[in-house]
From Swiss-Prot:
GO terms for biological process: auxin metabolic process. InterPro entries: Amidohydrolase, Bact_exopeptidase_dim_dom, ILR1-like_Hyd, Peptidase_M20, Peptidase_M20_dimer. This is IAA-amino acid hydrolase ILR1-like 5. It is an enzyme of class 3 (hydrolase). Keywords: Hydrolase, Signal. The lineage of its organism: Eukaryota, Viridiplantae, Streptophyta, Embryophyta, Tracheophyta. It comes from Oryza sativa subsp. japonica (Rice). It comes from the Eukaryota.
Length: 426
């Protein structure tokens, strides 16, 4: 019995060493392409484009994919999709967003935004470069891909629900799992963090109008004062969180502006206010929307006013909650430990920011996770959506290798399951 046990142990050791060698080789190969990836990112950063206007970015992505011998297809207006691998099932998707923000960049460097009032202040230029890097790595290894990797370059994440348009154009056809990553200024460069279950909030924006009756300030009894009514409405709305919601739930109701009136001696006819509603469950957001409508209309009526609430749909569509699949979350952590090392994988945190990656997750299991970019030496310390936001570009080859490993190892595991006859489900 000793000899077979020894051989088994030797096989395990060789297999483990071989796996480690492959992962080190992947990271080295990604690092060899660092200059190209960083160059792509800088070209995108210098020419930022807002949601559904990513024409230059989209053309750049298509050109780079075609140079790799991949067939790029236009979707969702300015989106791009390409497949690499066998062209057969199983199919796993990797997603990057491409749009910029209406922010004036205040970072002085050679590749500063050349577009006045527009900036890549959320790292989508980095996401695009990382996925293009993965496209190159995968295309070099396509003979060993046991299935198909679908690359999704998505427009309009910033409020435009671009993911929903990608879905309408069929990018998820045949896909059984999807992964996405987002740069995170809170973690050191190259550290990843994932969280299973509800991870990011369902989000919507609302506008409310309180209509009264204008009149001179010295005759309040002849007027219907919408200011008083709006004051009571806004205070009452805060009780929806403190008195109606389970304290263990995560919800946000913010009033972010109030406007109305332009004279000092008259009651205005109308007060308008608005803000955002957020919940870590999509169902919770629907409940909150319903109660906001009831409170605004009811409190306004108490004060002889008319209250109207509009949930914004067109320019700011509602986003569902991001819900990370538990098995795929485990896959991300396992791959992260193997590729980057155990010390580079941390528990993720729930946040109340929205992310339209959630639209994909409504149809297929998926995971959205963070990858750190914090590096004080290069000034990569600012929060996203900040005009001083800056990225440690060392993250780009790491992210490209991670995308590649996530897809490859997922498909390899699926092929192993098929060989032993086991069933795969999420």
């Amino acid at each position: 019995m000793a000899a077979p046990l020894f051989l088994l142990l030797l096989l395990l050791l060789v297999s483990s060493a071989s796996a480690g060698y492959e992962e080190e080789a992947l990271l080295r190969r990604a690092e060899e392409e660092r200059d190209w990836m960083v160059g792509v990112r800088r070209r995108i950063h210098a020419h930022p484009e807002l949601a559904f206007r990513e024409h230059h970015t989209s053309a750049l992505v298509r050109d780079e994919l075609e140079r790799l011998g991949l067939t790029a297809r236009a979707v969702a207006g300015t989106g791009v999709v390409a497949d690499v691998g066998s062209g057969l099932p199983p199919v796993v998707a990797l997603r990057a967003d491409m749009d910029a923000l209406p922010v004036q960049e205040l970072v002085e460097w050679e590749h500063k935004s050349k577009v006045d009032g527009v900036m890549h202040a959320c790292g989508h230029d980095v996401h695009t470069a990382m996925l293009l890097g993965a496209a190159k790595l995968l295309s070099e290894r396509k003979e060993q891909i046991k299935g198909t990797v679908r690359l999704l370059f998505q427009p309009a994440e910033e409020g435009g629900a671009g993911a929903s348009y990608m879905i309408k154009d069929g990018v998820l056809d045949g896909v059984e799992a999807i992964f996405g990553m987002h740069v995170d200024y809170r973690m050191p460069t190259g550290v990843i963090a994932a969280h299973a279950g509800p991870t990011q909030a369902a989000v919507c924006f609302y506008e409310a109008k309180i209509e009264g009756k204008t009149g001179k300030a010295e005759t309040p009894h002849l007027n219907v004062d919408p200011i008083v009514a709006a004051s009571f409405v806004i205070l009452s709305l805060q009780q929806l969180i403190s008195r109606e919601d389970d304290p263990l739930h995560s919800q946000v109701l913010s009033v972010t502006y109030v406007k109305g009136g332009n004279t000092i001696d008259a009651t205005p006819p109308v007060i308008e206010f608005g803000g955002t509603l957020r919940s870590l469950t999509t169902e919770g957001l629907y409940r909150l929307q319903k109660r906001v409508k009831e409170v605004v209309e009811g409190q306004a009526a108490v004060h002889r006013c008319k209250g109207v609430v509009q949930i914004k749909r067109d320019d700011y569509p509602m986003y569902p909650a991001v819900f990370n699949d538990e098995k795929l979350h485990h896959h991300v952590e396992t791959v992260g430990r193997r590729l980057l090392g155990p010390d580079k994988v941390k528990p993720g945190e729930k946040i109340m920011a929205g992310e339209d990656f959630a639209f994909y997750q409504q149809l297929v299991p998926g995971v959205m996770f963070g990858i750190g970019i914090r590096n004080g030496e290069v000034g990569s310390v600012h929060t996203v959506h900040n005009p001083k936001f800056f990225v440690d570009e060392d993250v780009i080859p790491i992210g490209a290798a991670l995308h590649t490993a996530l897809a490859e190892m997922y498909l390899t595991e699926r092929s192993t399951e098929g060989e032993d006859g086991s069933q795969h489900s999420h």
